[in-house]
C-alpha cells in the first residue's frame, strides 16, 4: 500500500443502524514502523452537525456516490501488516487510488483539523 491508496473498511454500523463499508484513504507514506495514517470518508447528511472541513464530490473518487466528507474524527493509524492481512482475508477491499489534487486537499484539511490528535498530526509532515 502507498500514500493515496484506498480501500473499503469492514462493515460498520451507520447512524441509521444499517451496516456499510466506508472508503478509507491512506494519507501518509509509511513511517519507520510501517504505519500509515488512514482517514475515513462518509456521506454528508447533516451539514450543521458533521465536520465539513473537507467535502468530497462524486468526481473525486469513483466509489463516492454522494456528496461526502472526510470524517477526521475517525482518523487512525494502521500498520502495513493490518492492512495487508485485512485485504488477504477479504475484510478490507482495495479500491482505486485518489488523484494527487484530492489527496493534497485531504492532507491540508487534516493538518488543520481539531479532531486529529497531535500524535497523528506529527506523521503528516
Predicted features and spans:
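Loop/turn positions that initiate beta-strands
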Residues: 4-5
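C-terminal terminal-subdomain/extension
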Residues: 60-125
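Compact nucleic-acid interaction/catalytic patches
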Residues: 15-62
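Beta-hairpin (beta-strand-turn-beta-strand) motif
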Residues: 12, 41, 75-77
